[in-house]
Amino acid sequence: MAGQTIIVSGLNPAAILQSTIGGGASPTAAAAENGTRKVIPLSRDALQDFMLSIITQKLQDEKQPFYVLDLGEVVSLIDQWKSALPNIRPFYAVKCNPEPSFLSILSAMGSNFDCASRAEIEYVLSLGISPDRIVFANPCKPESDIIFAAKVGVNLTTYDSEDEVYKIRKHHPKSELLLRIKPMFDGNARCPMGPKYGALPEEVEPLLRAAQAARLTVSGVSFHIGSGDADSNAYLGAIAAAKEVFETAAKLGMSKMTVLDVGGGFTSGHQFTTAAVAVRSALKQHFDDQPELTIIAEPGRFFAETAFTLATTIIGKRVRGELREYWINDGLYGSMNCVLYDHATVNATPLAVLSNRTNVTCGGSKTFPTTVFGPTCDALDTVLRDYQLPELQVNDWLVFPNMGAYTKAAGSNFNGFNTSAIVTHLAYAYPS
């Protein structure tokens, strides 16, 4: 790995990483400058020390929350994807987390991008990414966004209604279309997509005919089984349904479909392993006769979730008997909005930099039933209840792992707490 070149926003830190790995330098001794961005090479178990160095060196006065993005984790996840689904091109769902350094390394490692709005397209293009690496994967778009896509050359989009056909015919007739279908089984996902998007079986032929009458090219089919812990078996039925759409288009005399978009719903770990097996099996069963088929996907949380760690400061404390109540400087109106909108469960680890510097993780310490509140004035802003934590003090820190998916991207500035201002620090942790 030491000889591999990693590009981050035009940065090539390979030589500096080599000096750390091969030259015996301390984990934080080498940094690659790129404007105001640095990439710190680390061993896998040095991330905690890196966060402590940020806290002690940079945040003495203003103890603001911050993220650490582990680019090594991103590279590992991309390698896992290529190994498990080598014939499926990932189009990363920008809405999940648009951190620019994150997008840059995804791009450098070969990922393309799923954008849902003009703003997301503009953002991706601003990083120097070609428009032919973007799918405009929003089945219902404002006309102004369609006009913009035509102007900049984003020529692949999704639809699931006749009105969308009319808008595209009027403003972007050169665009190729993917018919978004609704899977009959959403996989019991935390965030199902079916109630809002996707053509029903009886709507497929009329929608194909509408595009045909408008002289638009329908290049293929897309679907999304839903986001977060979805049952991988949902891919089986969805891919079978997609094959039926291909066959219907052929019966209508339409041009041969060449693209299948299997959507998102992938989560790193065991779920991804089982999902990859299901997808490969279904593709072999239904599309083995089309070796020229281009297969794409729209993973978001698979790449983002485990790559980001959030560090927050304890700004307030209250003791009520055995109960410990802490206030931190991020919450449900900020990064932890995922608890409400993504139905996520967050976990906290202490960094007792003030009260227990010799044992910052408080290993072996007595724990107490704990409530953790966010900083806003809304009582809804409660991050954790009935959680076990050791005794902590104001200006100690709580660290939240796996905070890359639908966190900062969906945060607000409610009560003046500016989620968009939270800084992301870059590290590259090599496998142990």
UniProtKB/Swiss-Prot annotation:
Chief place where the protein resides: plastid
This protein's record includes keyword Transcription: no
The protein's Enzyme Commission number: 4.1.1.17
Disruption phenotype: Reduced alkaloids and nicotin levels associated with a lower putrescine production. Occasionally, an early senescence and a lower viability of the older leaves is observed.
SUPFAM superfamilies reported for this sequence: Alanine racemase C-terminal domain-like (SSF50621), PLP-binding barrel (SSF51419)
Pfam families found in the cross-reference section: Orn_Arg_deC_N, Orn_DAP_Arg_deC
Broad EC category: lyase
Binding site for substrate: 341-342, 378
Positions marked as site (Stacks against the aromatic ring of pyridoxal phosphate and stabilizes reaction intermediates): 224
N6-(pyridoxal phosphate)lysine modified-residue sites: 95
One annotated Gene Ontology cellular component of this protein: cytoplasm
GO biological process, alphabetically ordered: alkaloid metabolic process; nicotine biosynthetic process; polyamine biosynthetic process; putrescine biosynthetic process from arginine, via ornithine; response to wounding; tyramine biosynthetic process
Compartments, as annotated in UniProt: Plastid, Chloroplast
Binding locations of pyridoxal 5'-phosphate: 227, 265, 298-301, 406
Residue positions of the active site: 377
Cofactor(s) this protein requires: pyridoxal 5'-phosphate
Catalytic activity field: L-ornithine + H(+) = putrescine + CO2
Associated pathway: Alkaloid biosynthesis; nicotine biosynthesis; Amine and polyamine biosynthesis; putrescine biosynthesis via L-ornithine pathway; putrescine from L-ornithine: step 1/1
GO molecular function, one term: ornithine decarboxylase activity
Function per UniProt: Involved in the biosynthesis of pyridine alkaloid natural products, leading mainly to the production of anabasine, anatabine, nicotine and nornicotine, effective deterrents against herbivores with antiparasitic and pesticide properties (neurotoxins); nornicotine serves as the precursor in the synthesis of the carcinogen compound N'-nitrosonornicotine (NNN). Catalyzes the first and rate-limiting step of polyamine biosynthesis that converts ornithine into putrescine, which is the precursor for the polyamines, spermidine and spermine.
Protein family per UniProt: Belongs to the Orn/Lys/Arg decarboxylase class-II family.
Protein name as catalogued: Ornithine decarboxylase 1A, chloroplastic
Species of the source: Nicotiana tabacum
Gene that this sequence comes from: ODC1A
